[in-house]
Amino acid sequence: MDQDYRARLVYPFSGAISPHADIVDQATLAWAAMFGLLTDSLRHKSRRLQYGLLAARAYPRADREMLQIAADWIAWLFFMDDQCDETGIGRDLQRMIALHERFLAILDGATPEAHDCALTYALADLRRRLALRAPDNWLRRFSEHVRLYFTANRWETVNRQRGATPNVATYCAARLFSGAVYACFDLIELAEQIELPFYARHHSIVQQLEQAANNIICWCNDVLSYPKEMQHGDRHNLVLVIQGEHQCSLPEAIDRALDLHAREVATFVRKRTCVPYFDAAVNTALEKYVTGLQFWICANRDWSLTATRYAPTHKSQEMVMAVAQQ
């Protein structure tokens, strides 16, 4: 199957990259090593994945210190995902719940204890650094978004235990939270040095923009990563749930997913012109925030197209070819 479908992942706005990209990427690996997050199997892979470069594209206007926090947070998410896979926690609901509850306690200000894992100590360091730059209400919102991310992880685990594949509507509703995108959007305010008032952040148009941006990011990711999910027998992917629900071929499922993605891009562009006027200061902040959403959309695509994390292996390519020919 050719890769021409990737050319349909287009946006009517451009991304950017921080001048601190390379040094932040190197520092993130050093941070991960310091906290013992780099297992032997992850050490070589992490050098190639360049999580710091994803942060540098997602928050290109952040100062050096804030960009480092963002890069370390993004790396922490990936390391947690990888270590849950390696240790089997990703398929053990009770162990997952216990781990998540401990992480949430850390985000609420708890101190790591001797029995805690390396991820817990690393998260405590992130929380400490965030607390130096963010107000309490921001920390509470961030923690809530992480909690919703964990809840979506548990939902996926239950599905795997039952051998269940969700329908498209249910999957899309959960996908809004399973990628931790809202928690990453929270960092836009810190990166742009803005603070949106409650009434602006919770305005329906702003929330619709956030949801559209979230969908665009997650669905783009799904289109690019479906070979990896196929290889691992994981049906939590937009392409694969479309294929299952509609009993269609893999190329048709990809085409349908790309159509959904394109419609969501159109929704984002349309809603962007509908942002209401509050006052000069608030709308200046909103303009920076919406631009931050656009940076994240482009960052996700550009990094995913070059990162080895979603590059299909020889085995997954063979599986895709076999399914496509059925």
Curated annotation (Swiss-Prot):
Q: Which residues participate in substrate binding?
A: 175, 228, 309-310
Tell me which UniProt keywords the record has, alphabetically: Lyase, Magnesium, Metal-binding
UniProt: Mg(2+) 1 binding residues: 81, 85
Motif range (DDXXD motif): 81-85
From the UniProt record, give the pathway where this protein acts: Secondary metabolite biosynthesis; terpenoid biosynthesis
Annotated EC: 4.2.3.98
| Metal-binding as UniProt keyword | yes
- Name of one Pfam family that matches: Terpene_syn_C_2
Instruction: Please tell me where Mg(2+) 3 binds in this chain.
Output: 221, 225, 229
Binding, Mg(2+) 2: 85
Catalytic reactions of this protein: (2E,6E)-farnesyl diphosphate + H2O = (+)-T-muurolol + diphosphate
The Gene Ontology biological process annotation of the record reads: terpenoid biosynthetic process
According to the record, how does the cofactor bind?
Binds 3 Mg(2+) ions per subunit.
Q: Name one GO molecular function term.
A: terpene synthase activity
The answer to whether UniProt assigns keyword Metal-binding to this entry is yes
Query: Which residues bear the site annotation Plays a critical role for substrate recognition?
Result: 82, 156
Query: In this chain's numbering, which residues are marked as the site (Plays a critical role in the stabilization of intermediate cation)?
Result: 78
Q: Which cofactor does it need?
A: Mg(2+)
Annotated site location: Plays a critical role for abstraction of the pyrophosphate group: 179
In the UniProt entry, what is the domain comment? The Asp-Asp-Xaa-Xaa-Asp (DDXXD) motif is important for the catalytic activity, presumably through binding to Mg(2+).
> Which family does this protein fall into?
Belongs to the terpene synthase family.
Q: What does this protein do?
A: Catalyzes the conversion of (2E,6E)-farnesyl diphosphate (FPP) into (+)-T-muurolol via a 1,10-cyclization, which requires isomerization of FPP to nerolidyl diphosphate (NPP) and then abstraction of the pyrophosphate from intermediate NPP leading to a (E,Z)-germacradienyl (helminthogermacradienyl) cation.
- What is this protein called in UniProt? (+)-T-muurolol synthase ((2E,6E)-farnesyl diphosphate cyclizing)
- Phylogenetic placement of the source organism: Bacteria, Bacillati, Chloroflexota, Chloroflexia, Chloroflexales
